[in-house]
């Protein structure tokens, strides 16, 4: 199991939290969540069951996690969640 990533990021004057974690070989899933004040705004789950037997699995999973984490940060900064953020604000 790979240690997860957590980042707080400012966007349009508010702080958002992005968390990415690995569920481990028994449940080979990478989960990334975007939070605003404890509320989940978005999530992405990726299975890596198809690569369990790959050499250096931990390193490969860590790279997949980093990319998925960065993708969530980019999507936030690119405004993909603005409608959802506006819904929660009203």
Question: How would you label these PLM feature ranges?
Answer:
Residues 1-14:
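Negatively charged, low-complexity tracts enriched in Asp/Glu with abundant Ser/Thr
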Residues 6-8, 27, 75-78:
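Detector for Asparagine
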Residues 7, 44-46:
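Generic detection of short hydrophobic beta-strand segments and adjacent strand-loop junctions
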Residues 15, 22, 47:
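A broadly conserved detector of short glycine/acidic/proline-rich loop/turn motifs that flank catalytic sites
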Residues 19-42, 55, 59:
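Short, surface-exposed, low-complexity cationic segments
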Residues 46-90:
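Acidic, low-complexity intrinsically disordered segments
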């Amino acid at each position: 199991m790979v240690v997860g990533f957590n980042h707080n990021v400012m966007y349009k004057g508010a702080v958002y939290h992005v968390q990415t974690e690995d569920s481990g070989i028994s449940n080979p899933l990478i989960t990334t969540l975007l939070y605003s004040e404890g509320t989940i705004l978005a999530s992405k789950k990726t299975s890596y069951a198809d690569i369990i037997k790959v050499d250096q699995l931990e390193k490969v999973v860590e790279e997949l996690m980093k990319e998925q984490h960065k993708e969530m940060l980019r999507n936030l900064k690119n405004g993909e969640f603005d409608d959802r953020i506006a819904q929660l604000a009203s």
